[in-house]
Amino acid sequence: MNLYNTQCPVPKEQQPVHEYTSLKNSWFFCWPTLSRRSYNKKITIALLLNCLLVSPILLSIFPITKLPLKFFFSEFITSSLMTGFILIRLYLGWSYVVKRLMSATVFYEESGWYDGQIWVKPSEILLKDRFIGLYEVFPLLNKIKNTLSFLSLMISGPVLLFFYF
């Protein structure tokens, strides 16, 4: 029996567990839930697609025949920054959900007229939500943070070399 259905006045689409499952099942936000190999593959594909997107613009700024190193460094930096923005969006989505899961209260709107109300979770629902937050969502947030850290380390070298050459 679902505890939310019997005890919760919050509309289903605003319930933290429903928000968690909808993120987990969405095309974009499910990336961190994939295996490490599949997740890295998606991030690498995003990085390569970003390289393809920025290449025409950067070719007009840095002609590859005259400034090949500047072109390659700027392409890597720009595409990495765009991939970083994708990772930040992933992080923000999951951090919103974990905040709602870990909170003892849930803010919700019934009619959409900005008449928001606060519902205090009963202890069994709070325990279940915190369990999901701690053991399901926090590892995903750590995976995204580690990827962002690795990406920022990868950018630092080309940034220094860009200004050197």
UniProtKB/Swiss-Prot annotation:
The keyword Phosphoprotein does not apply. GO terms for cellular component: chloroplast. Pfam families: CGLD27-like. It is found in: Plastid, Chloroplast. Keywords: Chloroplast, Plastid. Transmembrane segments: none annotated. Its main location: plastid. The keyword Coiled coil does not apply. InterPro entries: CGLD27-like. Belongs to the ycf36 family. This is Uncharacterized protein ycf36. The gene is ycf36.
